[in-house]
Amino acid sequence: RICDDSSIPFLRTPQLCPKGQDVCYKKTPIVKKFKWLQKKGCASSCPKNGFIKIFKIECCTKDNCI
């Protein structure tokens, strides 16, 4: 799998994911002024919010899908 791992919203930096990490994800803070703190990368499963939902989380299973 190839996923983007850039933390900058408009920049794409594709990376080859380690074996077993077949999900691409993007975590974006819900508060708009903190959107630049987004995190993208590879995972073995889609990350989840904790007790309080502070991130919008998107996941997919195709190369460069987010």
From Swiss-Prot:
Keywords: Disulfide bond, Secreted. It is found in: Secreted. The keyword Disulfide bond applies. It comes from the Eukaryota. Disulfide bonds join C3-C24, C17-C42, C46-C59, C60-C65. Coiled coil: none annotated. One of its GO terms (molecular function) is toxin activity. Not toxic to mice when injected intravenously or intraperitoneally. This is Clarkitoxin-1. It comes from Micrurus clarki (Clark's coral snake).
